[in-house]
């Protein structure tokens, strides 16, 4: 099974259209490197020990990639809620390239592509006990 990462650059209301070129991620290749991690990059009152409960499974990451919409870097960095808790890992593209990904507890994520581009994602429809309430 493959998941699609969106590659277009046309923005409408802060999100990207799904109608353009796509790149497939091999679902079985999703590797979680860090789970329940804490980052000081986000200002907030979350403590590192609170992040230990944010544990994503491979299926959760796959569902995130499948359901998430692409957003602009501006929306990701300034407009969407953020959290200190995150998971990160790697995945293989159908063409053999490897991407790095990161998903936070506020349902924001990004994928660093082999060519250096970053795809920013947001998934308000993603549901699991580990994500913060919408």
Where are these regions (language model features)?
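Generic marker of residues within folded, mature protein domains
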Residues: 3, 20-22, 79-81
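Short, compact, well-ordered microdomains
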Residues: 94-119
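N-terminal trafficking/processing presequences and adjacent post-cleavage segments
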Residues: 8-66
């Amino acid at each position: 099974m493959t998941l699609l990462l969106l590659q277009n650059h046309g923005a409408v209301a802060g999100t990207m259209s799904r109608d353009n070129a796509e790149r497939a991620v091999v679902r079985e290749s999703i590797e979680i490197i860090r789970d329940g991690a804490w980052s000081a990059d986000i200002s907030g009152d979350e403590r590192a020990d609170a992040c230990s409960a944010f544990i994503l499974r491979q299926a959760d990451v796959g569902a995130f990639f499948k359901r998430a919409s692409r957003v602009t870097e501006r929306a990701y960095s300034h407009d969407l809620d953020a959290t200190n808790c995150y998971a990160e890992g790697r995945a293989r593209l159908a063409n053999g390239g490897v991407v790095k990904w990161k998903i936070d507890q506020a349902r924001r994520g990004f994928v660093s592509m082999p060519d250096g581009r970053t795809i920013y994602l947001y998934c308000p429809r993603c549901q699991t006990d580990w994500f913060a309430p919408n």
